[in-house]
Amino acid sequence: MDVKERSNQFRFFSLGGGNEVGRSCHIIQFKGKTIMLDAGIHPAYQGMASLPFYDDFDLSIVDVLLISHFHLDHAASLPYVMQKTNFKGRVFMTHPTKAIYRWLLRDFVRVTSIGSQSSNAEDDNLYSNEDLIESFDKIETIDYHSMIDVNGIKFTAFHAGHVLGAAMFQIEIAGLRVLFTGDYSREIDRHLNSAEVPPLPSDILIVESTFGTATHEPRLHREKKLTQLIHSTVNKGGRVLMPVFALGRAQELMLILDEYWSQHKEELGSNQIPIFYASNLARKCLSVFQTYVNMMNDNIRKKFRDSQTNPFIFKNIAYIKNLDEFQDFGPSVMLASPGMLQNGLSRDLLERWCPDEKNLVLITGYSVEGTMAKYLLLEPDTIPSVSNPEVTIPRRCRVEELSFAAHVDFQENLEFIEQINASNIILVHGEPNPMGRLKSALLSNYASFKGTEDEVHVHNPRNCYELDIECKGVKVAKAVGNIVDEIKRTEEEVVKPENDAGQSKEGIEEFTGKTQDVRKDAEGEGAIISSILVSDEKNFDLNLVSLSDLREHHPELSTTVIRERQTIQVDCKKELIYWHICQMFGDVSVLIDDDNVTNTKETKLETSRGMLVLQIMGAIRLTVQHNKAILEWTQGLISDTIADSIIAILMSVDSAPVSVKKSSNSCSHGHEHATPILSQPSETDKIKQVAELFKTQFGDSFTLILNKDDDNDTAEEKEDDEFVKGLITIGKNTASINFTDMCVVECNSNPLKGRVESLLKIGIDMVSSLC
C-alpha cells in the first residue's frame, strides 16, 4: 500500500476489528508515517485463523505500534508481530499494561495454541515462551499525559477507564490530530476512573462501537441484580459460574461480592457459601494491582489509606489454580477464566455444571460471535464437549446475562463523541448490526450540519478496506532563541500601560477602553517580526529563528553569506556624488574622507589618497576614488534594493539637471544675467501636497481643515486656528494632525500614530527643496 509522503490523504486500514469484535489491529498513515494500533487475536478462532490479516499489509513500514490495553483481543498477537514478521518499528504501552501483559501472554501460550488438537502442538504455536521473553524486552513504556515524539509522530496516552492501564492515544502528525479510544468506559466504577477527554481537539476520532445504540442500566441497579441472582441461586443449593477475563472486570466483580458477603456474614460468610477465583494468574497479578493502586479512583485510594491494607486482598474469596484443588460439595460461586468459555477452567466447569437445573451461568462480559459464551446465550438444549466435539452435553442450567463490561453505552459514547467534536468519525470494534445502528444514529444527530463546513462524516470500514480521508493539518511555527525576546518586546511596545497614579475611576475606565481598542488594532495590523522559518520535513516541525541563532538551534543547516561587489565608472566630483547620496538616503556615515568633501574636517590632509568611503543605510559600503565608485554589500532583499538605487544615482549623476545647477556655482567667472526669479511655492501649497498624500492613503477617512481668517473671530479663536488641521477617523481610532508643524497632535492608536508619522516624514521629504 503506497502512500505519497507529502500527500494530504489520511489512510485508515483495518487488519482486524473492522465490523467485528476481536483481533483488533488498525493501520493509520499520513505524510509518509505509519502507525499500528493494537495487535490482538480473535477469541472465537485458534492459531493462524485467530490473527489479524497481517499478510495484507507490509509491516516493515510501520514506525510505531501502540497497545491500548492487555486484553487478548488487543495484545495477544504482539509477540507474533515482533518475532515472526518483518516488523521493525517501536512498541509502546503503559506501565500497568506491560506488567500484566507478561503474565497474561505466558498463560495464553500455555493454554492456547494452533495445534491444540494435534500431536505436534508445541511446534504449531503462534509463538513460544522464548519469543514472548525476547519481544517483552523490546517494549517501551509510556506515562499518562506525557508526549512522546518518534521521528515526527507525536502521541500522548490518556486514561481510558476500561481496565487498569488502559489508554486512549491522541496522535499528531504534521498538525493532524487523531484520537484512538481503544476500549473505553465513561463510568466510574469501584476501582477505576472514567475515560478522559483530551484537552486538545482532534480532527479524526477512531472510536469503539461495541454496544451500538444499547443503553446500560445504572451501575448500582446492576450490582443489586447481580447479588440477588447469586444469593437466590446459592440459597436453593445451586452453583454459580461466572466466566470472566482473568484480569480487569474480575477484580471489579470480586470487590462487589467480597463487600456483599461481608454485609451478609450470617447467611453467607465463614465459608458457608464459598467464593472461588479459578485462575492461574490471580496471585501473580495481584502485586500489579497493589503497585498501581494510585492509578485508580479516589474510592479505592481512600480505602487503601484508611485501612492500610490492599483492597484487593479479599476476605471472602479463595484462589485455586486448577480443579484438582476444588472440592465440589454444595453451593458455591466460581469466577473462572477465560471469559468466552472456549477452553480452560471455565469451560470444564460449564460442562460439569450445565446439566443441573439448580445451577446458574452468569455472563458478565461482552460475548464475541462464534464463542461458546455467545452460543450459550441462545439457551441451547445441548453443548458440545471441548475435548470431543462429537459428544454433546445436555444444558439444563439457567443462563443469565448481566453486563459489567467496561464499554460505553450509546448515551455515553454520543456525549464523548460530541465533546471531541471531530469532523471524521471511524467506528471500530463492533459487530455489523450494532455498528450500523450507531452510524445511523450519529448521522441523524449531525444531520443539521450536512452540506456545511461543520459536516461530520461517519465511517465503518470492514477489514482490509482502505479508507482515504482528505486532511490538512494545522501548521504552527514555534519561536526559539532570541526571537522570543524580540516578540515579547514588540508586544510590550504595542500596548504600554500608562502611569495611572492618581487617575479617577472614569479615567481608568477610559484608559482601559483605549487599551482594548489598541489591542484590537494591533491584532488586525499585526506586529512585524523578521526571522527565518526553518521547516523540518522529517519531524514536521516549524521553527522561527533569528539569523544569529540559526547555527545554535539548527547546526545541521549549512549557511552561506553572499557578498556583492560592483564597480562603476564616474565622471564627476566626489562632492556631487556625496550631495546626491545625502539627498536620497537619510542614514549616511562617513568612514574615510581624505579630501574633506563632506566638510567634516577643519583642514585637508597634506598627503591625500583622494578616497571617499561612505556607509549607506548601515548596509552598503561605497568607495569613491579617482574615477571609480565601488559598492560592496551582503546580499539580501533590502540591501539589494538600496544598492540598485545607489547604482541608478551613480549612473545618472553627471547628467541630471540638478547636477548641472549644483556644479554651475563653482564657475570661475561671475556675472549676472537677467533671469526671472521663479516664485517659491507657498506653505499652503506644500500642505495641500502633503494632504493629497494622506488622501491617497486613507481615502474618505481623511479630512483636511483649512482655517480662514474671519473678522468676527475672537482673539482666542484666531489663536486656536493658527495651524492647518487634518483629521483621520478609522472606526474608534482617530488621529489629529498639525500640518503647519508637520506633527501628530493626538492619536489613540499607537499603530495608527506610527503610520501617520511615517507619512509625514515622506511628505516633508517630498515638498522639501532639492537645492
From Swiss-Prot:
GO cellular component, one term: mRNA cleavage and polyadenylation specificity factor complex
Annotated residues for binding of Zn(2+) 2: D73, H74, D183, H429
GO BP, sorted A to Z: mRNA processing; sno(s)RNA 3'-end processing; snoRNA splicing; termination of RNA polymerase II transcription
MF term (GO), any: RNA endonuclease activity
EC number(s) on file: 3.1.27.-
Main localisation: nucleus
Residues that coordinate or bind Zn(2+) 1: H69, H71, H162, D183
Pfam families found in the cross-reference section: Beta-Casp, CPSF73-100_C, Lactamase_B, RMMBL
SMART domains in alphabetical order: Beta-Casp (SM01027), CPSF73-100_C (SM01098), Lactamase_B (SM00849)
Active site: H407 (proton donor)
Keyword RNA-binding: no
Keyword vocabulary terms for this entry: Endonuclease, Hydrolase, Metal-binding, mRNA processing, Nuclease, Nucleus, Zinc
Domain of life of the organism encoding this protein: Eukaryota
Catalytic class of the enzyme: hydrolase
Localization: Nucleus
Gene3D superfamilies assigned to the protein according to its UniProt record, in alphabetical order: 3.40.50.10890, Ribonuclease Z/Hydroxyacylglutathione hydrolase-like
Family statement: Belongs to the metallo-beta-lactamase superfamily. RNA-metabolizing metallo-beta-lactamase-like family. CPSF2/YSH1 subfamily.
Functional summary from the UniProt entry: Component of the cleavage factor I (CF I) involved in pre-mRNA 3'-end processing.
Protein name: Endoribonuclease YSH1
Top-level taxonomy: Eukaryota, Fungi, Dikarya, Ascomycota, Saccharomycotina
Gene: YSH1
